[in-house]
Amino acid sequence: MSWYEKYNIVLNPPKRCSFACADNLTTILAEDGNNIRAILYSQPKKLKILQDFLATSRNKMFLYKILDDEIRRVLT
């Protein structure tokens, strides 16, 4: 018997971003484009995370069309 067999890990299923969550995110991105642009360029890992998030969450509830033009350009 291996030492790791005694561990039991139970993960809760991931929660989908609610409408309010998505609305808050897009509002922040739309209002503070210069700061977000600087963050994206200075932290490529966060840019990759945001790209992955947008790729998996594009649905009718996430209004990504209002993103700053520069962020939209970087993400596409």
Swiss-Prot record:
- Domain of life from the UniProt record: Viruses
Q: Induced by what? A: Expressed in the late phase of the viral replicative cycle.
Q: List the disulfide bonds.
A: C17-C21
Q: Name one Pfam family in it.
A: Pox_A3L
InterPro entries cross-referenced by the UniProt entry: Poxvirus_A2.5L
Q: Tell me which UniProt keywords the record has, alphabetically.
A: Disulfide bond, Late protein, Redox-active center
Biological role stated in the UniProt entry: Late protein which probably participates in disulfide bond formation by functioning as a thiol-disulfide transfer protein between membrane-associated OPG072 and OPG08. The complete pathway for formation of disulfide bonds in intracellular virion membrane proteins sequentially involves oxidation of OPG072, OPG128 and OPG08.
The family note in this entry says: Belongs to the orthopoxvirus OPG128 family.
Quaternary state and interactors = Interacts with sulfhydryl oxidase OPG072; this interaction involves formation of a transient disulfide-bonded intermediate, allowing disulfide bond transfer. Interacts with OPG088; this interaction involves formation of a transient disulfide-bonded intermediate, allowing disulfide bond transfer.
Q: What is this protein called?
A: Protein OPG128
- Origin species: Vaccinia virus (strain Western Reserve) (VACV)
